[in-house]
Amino acid sequence: MGDITRFGISIDSDLLDSFDRLITRKGYQNRSEAIRDLIRATIVEEKMDAGHEEMVGTVTMVYNHHVRDLADKLTEHQHQHHHQVISALHVHLDAHNCLEVLVLKGSSAEIKQIADELLGVKGVKHGKLFLTSATPEHH
């Protein structure tokens, strides 16, 4: 972590009031922490858009395990990308549905491609990809 630098910003009072309500609702101790988090989030987003930065992500999906060969297809996809898939969690939600959460590491482009492939497999009811930086910025 580098030296702390103080700086001032000019902001519309209505926007500041909205921001203050937001940071109170989210439990921030002060504006500085909230602004630091916004800056970090923007930097992570830039890395995702670049496509070549190392990222980590989770793919969460729900599927009906009775769909023919679906579990085998999903497992095969994971094995095809064994360098990127670093962990998997499988949960039986009920007699028919399963939740699977995969943790992936690689470039954002690789992770997005793998997620698209998995979520596009026939029988996957729904799912979502969450990406973040594998190299966190300073606190």
Curated annotation (Swiss-Prot):
It comes from the Bacteria. Ni(2+) binds at residues 79, 90, 92, 98. One of its GO terms (biological process) is response to nickel cation. Keywords: DNA-binding, Metal-binding, Nickel, Transcription, Transcription regulation. Pfam families: NikR_C, RHH_1. Binds 1 nickel ion per subunit. Its cofactor is Ni(2+). Coiled coil: none annotated. GO terms for molecular function: DNA binding; DNA-binding transcription factor activity; nickel cation binding. Belongs to the transcriptional regulatory CopG/NikR family. NCBIfam families: PRK00630.1, PRK01002.1, PRK02967.1, PRK04460.1. Transcriptional regulator. This is Putative nickel-responsive regulator. It comes from Trichlorobacter lovleyi (strain ATCC BAA-1151 / DSM 17278 / SZ) (Geobacter lovleyi).
